[in-house]
Amino acid sequence: FISGEPVDVLLAPNLGELGSGDFERGAEFIRIGEASAEAQLKELRAFALPPAEYAAWRAARVRPPTDAPRLAALRFEGAVLSEPHRWLDILGSRAGQPFNAEEAVRDTRKLAASGDYSRVDFRLEPSLAGDELVFDLEEKPWGPNYLRIGLDLSTDDSGAGGFQLRLSHNRHWLNRLGAEWRNQATIGRNPRLFSEFYQPLSESFGSSHDGFAAVWGELQRREQRLFDPAGSETAQLTRKALTWGLDFGRPWGRLGELRLGLWQETARWSKRISEIELPEARLGQLQRLRGVRLRVDFDQLDAASFPRDGWRLNLTGISGRQTGLADRAERLEASATHVKSWGLATLNLQARAARTRAQADVPGGPYTLGGFQQLSGLRTDQLSGNALLLLRASAYWRLSQHPVLTRGWFAGASLEAGNVWLEPGRIGLHGLRSAGSVFLGADTGIGPLYLALGAESGGGRAVYLFLGRP
């Protein structure tokens, strides 16, 4: 409130989708505030001073410029389990440089983004050596163990669907270098166990010699169905696989990370139900693929669900030997996302491509398409093969400025084109199948929720209830 005579005037700008955490959108806050004040100028003029008095008031508030103090040191307080000194190299504030309040604010955001602190403040504190910049940290009370729960649920009007409960556990700061133990478990249609020990090799994150080593293992069982060209199910198979790896890598600034290491997968197929002839001997044979893996993960999206800005790039390449193949075995996988918004409208462009060299008589293949936004209108995993290409453009609009029970409601549509091939050499833009969907979505605490209608160029139609990321 602004108090005065004869009445009080309430200024209540409509902030729309802006929230208290949108620090980087300060200019928008200012514009909205100015517009709100200008709309009430008539009421506000009752509080105005005469021009001479206002000029005198402004002159009395002017302070002579002073030089910013030069920082003698940077110091951290409040850390018990974590080692915040690891982040010194990525902070913009430096000992020996003049203090910059805006830079210090940016540094608090970088420290908060590490995930270990529930509060980060700063202050200047005099010392015998000079002014010190002190970062006051409050570690998350539930750390250093972090648990997350997610849910994947899908069903269509044919009755096909799946349910998966996802659990993750991260244990931070196992040693002073910031080692982590990362665990994931999936319960449901395709159960999975994953565990990784991640060990940084440097005391300073972001330094020129920064790097890490990671050893990991994964146990997974995946159901795969085979379909005839008309879309009728002909077989149900199960693939069990044990995969492990030893990686060496390094972060690439704030973009993401690169990894290079040894990789091995041991897998076996088994038949559950089949109406067609299958190579029984090959199905029961143990398959091994071992080699060298290169992986690049860059993620600059502003949100995991319904992002409004940014991009993401994932590249994986494996070269090695596989049981039964005389030539070298290869796997190449790539996916890219670019997101741009205009007001409440967002355009999301995605591309995904993959290919592998496998034995010709192995049924299906490791890559599948079919289901919501994976050629909508087809049954889940209806297409399978050894090469895949999918192009998708989605547009969605935020429906509510002040959502209830969710972080936002969205309405949107997608256009999709893609296919899979049994022969990897046939992958290309020719022969792509087209599809599309319209959907209503909500960003919930356990993942994005969709109610959608899908259609495919071959005549496939489906209604989806989908919880999770397509």
Which residues fall in each region the model found?
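A generic beta-sheet turn/junction motif
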Residues: 80, 126-128, 340-344, 442-446
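Conserved catalytic block of serine-dependent lipid acyl chemistry
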Residues: 1-18, 28-34
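Periplasmic polypeptide-binding modules associated with outer-membrane biogenesis and secretion
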Residues: 27-154, 168, 184-201, 242, ...
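Conserved active-site loop/cleft motifs that coordinate metal ions or position small ligands
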Residues: 10-13, 412-414, 441, 448-454
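C-terminal outer-membrane beta-barrel translocator/porin domains of Gram-negative envelope proteins
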Residues: 113, 119-121, 132, 144-156, ...
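Gram-negative/organellar outer-membrane beta-barrel architecture
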Residues: 102, 107, 116-295, 301, ...
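A short alpha/beta connector and helix-capping loop motif
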Residues: 427-439
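A short, acidic, flexible beta-alpha connecting loop/helix-capping segment that sits on the rim
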Residues: 15-17, 25, 454-460
